[in-house]
Regions:
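Short, acidic, metal-binding catalytic loop of nucleotide-sugar glycosyltransferases
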Residues: 24-33
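Short beta-strand/loop segment that forms part of the nucleotide-sugar
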Residues: 33-43, 61-63
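A conserved acidic beta->alpha catalytic loop
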Residues: 40-48, 92-93
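Glycine-rich, basic loop-to-helix element that forms the pyrophosphate-binding segment
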Residues: 63-80
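Short aromatic/hydrophobic "clamp" motif used to bind/position activated sugar donors
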Residues: 85
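Conserved donor NDP-sugar-binding/catalytic core segment of glycosyltransferases
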Residues: 93-130
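A short, conserved alpha-helix in the catalytic core of glycosyltransferases
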Residues: 145, 151-156, 162-190
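Non-catalytic, C-terminal membrane-associated alpha-helical segments of glycosyltransferases
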Residues: 208, 223-290
Length: 290
């Protein structure tokens, strides 16, 4: 079997059958990753046992308390044996069987890349052709990307949050950007996310998405740019109202003070210039020549 020098990591929480499906697809890739590691959140013993029975070669890490997908990925990347670490959710997996060979080609072509983000498709969405195109972007999807392990560790990893919407990837991407790291997004890498995203309408997700935007601004923006964070929170609330996601809005707003206090030890701001250039790249990604 061809060795590719890639670790694959999966963050799992409660969805046992979907976790096993993701592992089956990873194992069927050609070439497949050199190792697969799974983090099981919230002491999910049923999931741990199912993996041990079906895929005994997979390394399993367990957290007794909920640390969220970001906290799980922190542990997985610390334990990974290889420099390139392909990251998936328990319900996301490669569409193309040669996914990992393509990953190596992209890292070889773009050797200054910190993260490569795949095109992510959800249930019910049309899947586009795997065109050999790429661009430099501000953001990435944690369940459909490949990390350069050294860059991830140098940036400090994720802030562990049980409900991380609106915070975890943006926060890490901003810190990477401030350090000169680069994120490449490519349509040549395709990942399927086996969900219809209905859970995004749950009240706790709505609340978390508001409070996390405030947390991002508090942890990373200089005080002179806190007005941008306030505007981002306001825009999020307006978007939620327009889309009928009313439940959780008030909770999200009222939890902000406590949310900031609870995570104040993570505060490490980046420069005014870094925030502005990051937001500019988010608005206008740059073409990368393949």
């Amino acid at each position: 079997m061809q060795k590719v020098g890639i670790s694959a990591i999966v963050t799992a929480y409660e969805r046992v059958d979907q976790t096993l499906k993701t592992l089956r697809i990873l194992e069927s890739c050609d070439p497949k990753p050199d190792e697969i590691l799974v983090h099981v959140d919230g002491n999910g013993i049923e999931c741990v046992d199912a993996i041990a029975r079906t895929y005994p070669q997979v390394r399993v890490l367990v957290s007794n308390d909920r640390v969220g997908p970001g906290g799980g990925r922190n542990k997985l990347l610390a334990a990974a044996s290889h420099e390139f670490v392909a990251s998936f959710d328990d319900d996301s997996y490669p569409i193309d069987s040669d996914y990992f060979a393509r990953v190596l080609q992209l890292f070889d072509r773009f050797q200054d890349t910190s993260i490569i983000s795949a095109s992510l498709y959800h249930a019910g969405e049309a899947i586009s052709l795997d065109e050999r195109e790429a661009r430099w972007t501000a953001d990435f999807s944690g369940g459909a990307c490949v990390f350069r392990r050294a860059a991830f560790i140098a940036a400090g990893g994720y802030v562990p949050l049980p409900v991380a919407y609106g915070m975890e990837e943006s926060d890490l991407a901003l810190r990477l950007h401030a350090q000169g790291g680069k994120i490449l997004s490519s349509s040549w890498l395709r990942v399927f996310h086996d969900t219809d995203l209905k859970r995004h309408a749950e009240p706790q997700v709505t609340a978390g998405s508001i409070a996390n935007l405030a947390l991002l601004a508090y942890l990373r923006y200089p005080v002179s740019l806190w007005s941008i964070g306030i505007l981002q929170c306001a825009n999020r609330v307006l978007w939620l109202l327009r889309h009928g996601r009313h439940r959780g809005i008030w909770r999200g707003l009222t939890m902000i003070p406590g949310h900031l206090r609870a995570h104040r030890h993570f505060r490490l701001t980046v420069s005014n210039r870094a925030v502005r250039s990051y937001l500019a790249l988010r608005r206008a990604p740059a073409h990368a020549s393949l």
